[in-house]
Amino acid sequence: MLQEPSAAFSLRRNSFRRRSPRSNVDDRGWNPLHIKARKGDLKSVKQLLDQGMDVNALAWGPKSKGVSALHLAAEGGHIEVMDLLLERGANIDAKTWGSCGWTPLHAAAKERKREAVKFLVENGAFLADDITDTRFNPPVHYCHGLEWAYEEMKKLNSESSSSSGGDTSSSSDN
């Protein structure tokens, strides 16, 4: 009698393995790419992308409405994984669904992953002061760590403008 459940489990496990990795999702709606990106497993993320997983696939679970692998890598502060995902075409400004509309930059800021925020801003992530959600609340309303992201972005912008500004006297010449 113990052999029947064991055999049934073995059959289910083997049939699960035969399915395409694109169809495997957990109770959060995460596929293997989401899971490996959140863990920061660069080798596995590369393998999954090489096997054809969609770099912009979104998770659809009770608490994962539109979360991408880039959101999860940013949340974990996994720079190398984020770099690979962007290299493969991940949307740097992908927004989650629902009232928040968080981008990967929001996710990194919420977890106070300074290097991830810096990396995203340097790679073109957009975070305007006037972004609002469907309730007209700015992201800072939902994420107490976001004030820091705005400060980091301003700091990076001022550093880049001061390094590229060089000679400003040409406009004041008479």
From Swiss-Prot:
Changing residue 10 to A: Normal phosphorylation by PHYA, normal repression of PHYA-mediated PIF3 phosphorylation, and normal interaction with PHYA. Mostly expressed in flowers, cotyledons, leaves and siliques, and, to a lower extent, in roots and stems. Also detected at low levels in seedlings grown in continuous dark or light conditions. Expressed in male and female gametophytes. SUPFAM superfamilies: Ankyrin repeat. ANK repeats lie at residues 28-57, 65-94, 100-129. GO terms for cellular component: cytoplasm; mitochondrion; nucleus. The modification Phosphoserine is found at residue 15. Keywords: ANK repeat, Cytoplasm, Mitochondrion, Nucleus, Phosphoprotein, Repeat. The keyword Mitochondrion applies. Residues 1-29 are annotated as: Disordered. Residues 1-13 have a biased composition (Low complexity). GO terms for molecular function: phytochrome binding. Disruption phenotype: Embryonic lethality in homozygous mutant. In heterozygous plants, impaired male-female gamete recognition when pollen of ank6 mutant is placed on ank6 female gamete. Defects in female gametophyte development at the one-nucleate stage. Abnormal hypocotyls length. Reduced accumulation of anthocyanin in seedlings grown under far-red light, in response to high light and after sucrose treatment, associated with lower levels of the UDP-flavonoid-3'-glucosyl-transferase (A3G2XYLT/UF3GT), a major enzyme in the anthocyanin biosynthesis processes. GO terms for biological process: double fertilization forming a zygote and endosperm; embryo sac development; male-female gamete recognition during double fertilization forming a zygote and endosperm; negative regulation of protein phosphorylation; positive regulation of anthocyanin biosynthetic process; response to far red light; response to high light intensity; response to sucrose. SMART domains: ANK. Phosphorylated by PHYA. The keyword Ligase does not apply. InterPro entries: Ankyrin_rpt (IPR002110), Ankyrin_rpt-contain_sf (IPR036770). Changing residue 16 to P: Abolished phosphorylation by PHYA. Impaired repression of PHYA-mediated PIF3 phosphorylation. Normal interaction with PHYA, but decreased interaction with PIF3. Coiled coil: none annotated. Promotes anthocyanin accumulation through interaction with PHYA, especially in response to far-red light, high light and sucrose treatment, probably by triggering A3G2XYLT/UF3GT expression. Required for gametophytes development as well as male-female gamete recognition during fertilization, possibly by regulating mitochondrial gene expression. Represses PHYA-mediated PIF3 phosphorylation. Interacts with phytochrome A (PHYA), both in Pr and Pfr forms. Binds to PIF3, a repressor of photomorphogenesis in response to phytochrome-mediated light signaling; this interaction may trigger the repression of PHYA-mediated PIF3 phosphorylation. Interacts with SIGE/SIG5 in mitochondrion. Interacts with RPS9M (via C terminus). This is Phytochrome-interacting ankyrin-repeat protein 2. The lineage of its organism: Eukaryota, Viridiplantae, Streptophyta, Embryophyta, Tracheophyta.
